[in-house]
Amino acid sequence: MSLVIKNLQRVVPIRRVPLRRKMDLVRSILGVKKFDLGIICVDNKTIQNINRIYRNKNVPTDVLSFSFHENLKAGEFPQPHSPDDYNLGDIFLGVEYILQHCRESEDYCDVLTVTATHGLCHLLGFTHSSKAEWQKMYNQEKLVLEELSRYTGARLQPLSRGLY
């Protein structure tokens, strides 16, 4: 199905083609290419507003995920009942925030890919609210990014690295 990447900000230039290519690979690795996915790139003001409304945190952040399917357990695939259910949800990338926290030695597109992969794991039920949940999420991210690295040659590390 489709991967839609929308850039709703003008602060940071976004190269959508490489991001799309990498996220299509991530979707293949995870086995979710038959599901629609939205990735929306926003600035600090917008991501802060969304974070305030949905998480009661009035600060910008790197990624927010909104799953189409509720109550998925870590690693479960959605069980669509109709064609309209073939949707994973939307990932909002705070691209300005991500750029501000990107190290000089890091490739910005790689960091966007890692962050979007983290968001996609959330859409598949992974969380990091406890050490046990974090370990599952970290392992999943690591597995996916290692496989992606084989295709791209990049050395990608999970976003959730070092949370616990």
UniProtKB/Swiss-Prot annotation:
Binds 1 zinc ion. Keywords: Endonuclease, Hydrolase, Metal-binding, Nuclease, Zinc. It is an enzyme of class 3 (hydrolase). GO terms for molecular function: metal ion binding; metalloendopeptidase activity; RNA endonuclease activity. SUPFAM superfamilies: Metalloproteases ('zincins'), catalytic domain (SSF55486). Disulfide bonds: none annotated. Its EC number is 3.1.-.-. Its cofactor is Zn(2+). The keyword Metal-binding applies. The keyword Protease does not apply. Zn(2+) binds at H118, H122, H128. GO terms for biological process: rRNA processing. Gene3D superfamilies: Metalloproteases ('zincins'), catalytic domain. GO terms for cellular component: mitochondrion; nucleus. HAMAP family: Endoribonucl_YbeY. Belongs to the endoribonuclease YbeY family. Single strand-specific metallo-endoribonuclease involved in rRNA maturation. This is Endoribonuclease YbeY.
